[in-house]
């Protein structure tokens, strides 16, 4: 059975929104120098040990791989374009009015994460047409 402290942390994690969970994963990856990407092949248990034992060789192949998942980041929204951008954000994300408004006002913030390049470019185009400054990572 998990300790009381672990149970509290687990409950906090359950309460996170999808965007907050994504931010948490990125922060953990940066803080500990690890990757949350699923290991290839059937060596699920051996992969983390190998990565921990030899981090330099494991990091070398990564730049060679072509990026397949992209994040659309809402960088800035001019005050006079806020309503138009808000409508597009709601359409793209399915968020409610309050959540979409919070996202738009908290820029820079990710709108969509881990999506194909074509979809990311379409979303970027829609947001820019509405007046937002957008970046695809």
Swiss-Prot record:
One GO term describing the cellular component: cytosolic large ribosomal subunit
Record's subunit section: Homodimer. Part of the ribosomal stalk of the 50S ribosomal subunit. Forms a multimeric L10(L12)X complex, where L10 forms an elongated spine to which 2 to 4 L12 dimers bind in a sequential fashion. Binds GTP-bound translation factors.
UniProt name for this protein: Large ribosomal subunit protein bL12
Gene3D superfamilies to which the protein is assigned, alphabetical: 3.30.1390.10, Single helix bin
Family: Belongs to the bacterial ribosomal protein bL12 family.
Protein's job: Forms part of the ribosomal stalk which helps the ribosome interact with GTP-bound translation factors. Is thus essential for accurate translation.
HAMAP family with a match to the protein in the record: Ribosomal_bL12
GO biological process, alphabetically ordered: translation
The entry's keywords: Ribonucleoprotein, Ribosomal protein
Highest taxon of the lineage: Bacteria
SUPFAM superfamilies assigned: ClpS-like, Ribosomal protein L7/12, oligomerisation (N-terminal) domain
Keyword Ubl conjugation in record: no
Pfam families named in the record: Ribosomal_L12, Ribosomal_L12_N
Gene Ontology terms for molecular function: mRNA binding; structural constituent of ribosome
